[in-house]
């Protein structure tokens, strides 16, 4: 992260730089371990705020016009409990890689049904599990209705705050986790900008890409030689 910040400072001081994308990940790690600890998280937010102010001032000294947009890609949900979905599936008379395939993430289980009968058995096995199968409409709303089912033919999403343990991600739960229903209040992301966003409404995380693309296209038009 320090290397990213140093590169951003160097770019901000370069008059030929027109767009900077700065990625930081320290806050994500802190929230996984210290979700709900306002003192710990507050100190990191203050540090980021200071970095943003310094970057903005530095860029303003070397450019006529400067705008700054800060956004996050997800929230963080406190741990409420764990669920062993894999154990429920392993009890079935099904062969992994022959009848079905599965990937156990921290908050969801993704399934591919290699034999038609496997779907009914797996669905029944998780009937009492705390969560729900994502509907096709939900997948479309969330932007994950991929026709090739690359990321799951069917996805079982846990209720907010629960974690699959053990999973393909971890053997022990973390105090905080993300990857739940984006409509849950702890899943909300954030966006702050010195420039109005009326020309590019941001409704979900995927819109951040469109926003950056739009700003880059605008810069290209503004700097295009006559």
Q: Which positions does each model-derived feature cover?
A:
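A long, amphipathic alpha-helix that forms part
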Residues: 6-20, 27-68, 213-215
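Structural motif
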Residues: 19-23, 69, 155, 192
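Short catalytic/ligand-binding loop motif for oxyanion handling, primarily in non-cytosolic enzymes
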Residues: 29-32, 77-80, 85, 164-166, ...
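Histidine-centered active-site/metal-ligand motif
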Residues: 32-34, 74, 175-181
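Short secondary-structure boundary/capping segments
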Residues: 35-39, 83-87, 171
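Acidic/histidine-rich catalytic neighborhood
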Residues: 65-66, 74-114
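Active-site metal-binding loops of divalent metal-dependent hydrolases
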Residues: 72-75, 160
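Active-site neighborhoods of enzymes that stabilize oxyanions during catalysis
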Residues: 98-219, 223
